[in-house]
């Protein structure tokens, strides 16, 4: 039985800002402690001082667990709506449940499922995966090198996911982006449903169709990425971070949810699957926020501003200031706040990377370390992301690889003694 109690509170009643999973408290009920139950966790999500209203939800379960989450927000008209983080959290729970169900139903490796039936010879599927690997090597060299440490089955599955994500992104950000319409995205989504049903259209689809038949991957993150492309077609401003968070989830956070079922959680890990997926989501959010901060000038020249409008206003800035592209003290202050937020998501992500299967950690660590350096470069450019593109030199990129490899060898955070938990 679950009891839900909701009340709307004003932002004045919330003196602190809490990001995604940034704070956890222990709450125990003497009644349930006497029954020998474990003390449960109290989690608080996305309560922003900049929001006019927040709706806090308390849940009490029959095991004595009490949860508080920002599942709803109230708009100025007084209408209650689901917050972006809660929408995403529901997808995380679904994906984590799929993995748990797969683990319970079969202790066998996900790598031993038979190939899907394809027209032609069995070599067609191998060729499809090989071509995916070539695309990954061409456009994501560092990440590709990291995947070479993974098992062949996991490696080629990650390549297939990468290629689908790249093709999807190219629809609205490639050479033919100006010709893409909502109906074209509808057709792409229908094609996605077909490949999940084992009806691929081409060799790249065939690779992904085989991948989703082998691993407990849900279609929802893929559908959500297509939704992110739709958002790009019709939206060029984001009034607050809640809106921007949802966009970041659609176009990048989804990648983490697609990848974890393939990369796998370390058998020895004591972490809950949900926490690992949350961390993967955080890495996607962090990467996209970093992309946004790096490309402010480039996006502005396209008439787009992927920055929270309310936070720009709080800093005394406007769209015109972004289009003018002059670095001022106000801009520096605003950027410091945005960079701090991105780093918070990177910190959240680090906790989950250690829980992945060891062979899968290196490419993820490499991505995390390299993207985080982009934030350092923005600072080194004195926050001029209007005319200077933050670029991590080849020397620094190469230097990050052995560091990433070293981190990939560490035992999962859930197994470390407290004295080593920050290593």
From Swiss-Prot:
Q: Which Gene3D superfamilies match?
A: Farnesyl Diphosphate Synthase (1.10.600.10)
Biological process terms from the Gene Ontology for this record are: carotenoid biosynthetic process
Entry keyword Phosphoprotein: no
Compartment annotation:
Plastid, Chloroplast
InterPro entries annotated for this entry? Isoprenoid_synthase_dom_sf (IPR008949), Squ/phyt_synthse (IPR002060), Squalene/phytoene_synthase_CS (IPR019845), Trans_IPPS_bact-type (IPR044843), Trans_IPPS_HH (IPR033904)
In the UniProt record, the transit peptide is located at 1-136
What catalytic activity does the UniProt entry give for this protein? 2 (2E,6E,10E)-geranylgeranyl diphosphate = 15-cis-phytoene + 2 diphosphate
Keywords tagged on the record = Carotenoid biosynthesis, Chloroplast, Isoprene biosynthesis, Plastid, Transferase, Transit peptide
Top-level enzyme category: transferase
Q: What is its EC number?
A: 2.5.1.32
One cellular component GO annotation, for this chain's record?
plastoglobule
Q: State the pathway, as annotated in the record.
A: Carotenoid biosynthesis; phytoene biosynthesis; all-trans-phytoene from geranylgeranyl diphosphate: step 1/1
Subunit and partners:
Monomer.
Which PANTHER family is this protein grouped with?
Answer: BIFUNCTIONAL LYCOPENE CYCLASE/PHYTOENE SYNTHASE
Q: Which family does it belong to?
A: Belongs to the phytoene/squalene synthase family.
Q: What does this protein do?
A: Catalyzes the reaction from prephytoene diphosphate to phytoene.
The protein depicted here goes by the name: Phytoene synthase, chloroplastic
Annotated organism of origin: Narcissus pseudonarcissus (Daffodil)
């Amino acid at each position: 039985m679950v009891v839900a109690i909701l009340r709307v509170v004003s932002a004045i009643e919330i003196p602190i800002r809490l990001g995604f999973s940034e704070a956890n408290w222990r709450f125990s009920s003497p009644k349930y402690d006497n029954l020998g139950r474990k003390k449960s966790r109290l989690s608080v999500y996305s309560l922003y001082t900049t929001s006019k209203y927040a709706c806090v939800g308390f849940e009490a379960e029959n095991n004595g667990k009490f949860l508080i989450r920002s599942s709803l927000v109230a708009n100025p008209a007084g209408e209650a709506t689901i917050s972006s983080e809660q929408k995403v959290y529901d997808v995380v729970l679904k994906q984590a449940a799929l993995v748990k169900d797969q683990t319970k139903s079969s202790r066998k490796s996900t790598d031993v499922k038979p190939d899907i039936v394809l027209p032609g010879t069995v070599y067609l599927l191998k060729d499809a995966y090989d071509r995916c690997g070539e695309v990954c090597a061409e456009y994501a060299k560092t990440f590709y090198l990291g995947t070479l440490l993974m098992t062949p089955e996991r490696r080629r599955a990650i390549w297939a996911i990468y290629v689908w994500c790249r093709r999807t992104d190219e629809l609205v950000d490639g050479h033919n982006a100006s010709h893409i319409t909502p109906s074209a995205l509808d057709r792409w989504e229908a094609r996605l449903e077909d490949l999940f049903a084992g009806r691929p259209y081409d060799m790249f689809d065939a690779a992904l169709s085989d991948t989703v038949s082998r691993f407990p991957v849900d279609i929802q993150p893929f559908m959500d990425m297509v939704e992110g492309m739709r958002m790009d077609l019709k939206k060029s401003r984001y009034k607050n971070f809640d809106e921007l968070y949802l966009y970041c989830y659609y176009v990048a956070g989804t990648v983490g949810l697609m990848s974890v079922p393939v990369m796998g959680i370390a058998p020895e890990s004591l972490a809950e699957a949900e926490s690992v997926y949350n961390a993967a989501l955080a890495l996607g959010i962090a990467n996209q926020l970093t992309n946004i901060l790096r490309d402010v000038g480039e996006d502005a020249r396209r008439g787009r501003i992927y920055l929270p409008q309310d936070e720009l206003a709080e800093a005394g800035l406007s769209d015109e200031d972004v289009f003018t592209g002059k670095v001022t003290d106000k801009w520096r202050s605003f950027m410091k706040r945005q960079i701090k937020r991105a780093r918070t998501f990177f910190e959240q992500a680090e906790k989950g990377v250690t829980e992945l299967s060891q062979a899968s950690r290196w490419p993820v660590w490499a991505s995390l370390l390299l993207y985080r350096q982009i934030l350092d470069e923005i600072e080194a450019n004195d926050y001029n992301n209007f005319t200077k593109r933050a670029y991590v030199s080849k020397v620094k990129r190469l230097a990050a690889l052995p560091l990433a490899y070293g981190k990939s060898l560490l035992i999962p955070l859930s197994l470390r003694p407290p004295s080593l938990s920050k290593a």
